[in-house]
Amino acid sequence: MSTSRNIQHIHGYYSPDDLFGKIIEGLDKLGKDLANVTLDDLQPVDEFHIRGDTATRELIRLAEFTPDMHILDVGCGIGGSTRRLSRETGCRATGVDLSDVYIDTANRLTQLLDMQERVAFHACSALELPFEDNFFDGVWSLQMNMNVEDKLSWLRETCRVLKPGGRAVFYEVCGNRNSPLYFPVPWAQDGSMSYLLSPELFREAMRAAGFVIEVWNDKTDLAQKAFANAK
């Protein structure tokens, strides 16, 4: 599949109808006060990466971002981890995602929480970020590589917008040559939009893109426990 067709395919997969309305309807059914919605009220739907807000908080501690920083969230979805990152560190945060439906929902949820002064979102491809070189103090990306076929271009583009000496935090799913992948999975209905690398190849791609790896934590066991507990 060509890059443009692949992007269109992924965009369609992540563009559900009236997502914001469905979230509001769900909150109402749970008896939430829609005039006083909190980050934790939204957590079940807006932090749907593996281990949810528990993982987000671990990554926030690892990142050590500070209030004077401007952080880019690449593949932000509807912005849950972007908002939590900003709320808990005080940093400015900008999220980008390919899905304009996700971005519209992210902006509306951010306004609902009155966080729009510190958090903003833009629809774009991670392969062509609309920012100047050395623009962000830090980069944050949670489980988006699985849909990216050209990982080197994505990582190079992410590195390009990061200031020299800036820190990037990636929380990603990698493949295992000895374990076949059975579809559907959370990020793909079939193999046409799933592109997993082994941990070894992912590290090679990161280094080739210009990153220096300081910390590498394998959370496979915790992820497996999270899936087992969800059954």
Regions found by a protein language model. Give the residues of each.
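A short SAM/SAH-binding and catalytic strip from SAM-dependent methyltransferases
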Residues: D137-D150
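N-terminal auxiliary segments of SAM/dcSAM-dependent transferases
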Residues: M1-K29
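Substrate-binding/catalytic lobe of Class I Rossmann-like enzymes that use SAM or dcSAM, i.e.
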Residues: G191-K231
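A short acidic, Gly/Pro-enriched loop at the edge of an enzyme's catalytic core
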Residues: L127-G138
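A short glycine-rich, Lys/Arg-flanked "PGG" loop and its adjoining helix->strand segment in the class I
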Residues: L152-R167
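Class I SAM-dependent methyltransferase SAM/SAH-binding core
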Residues: H70-E128
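Conserved alpha-helix/loop element of class I SAM-dependent methyltransferases that forms part
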Residues: K32-D33, H49-M69
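Short, glycine-/aromatic-enriched active-site segment of Class I SAM-dependent methyltransferases
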Residues: V173-M193
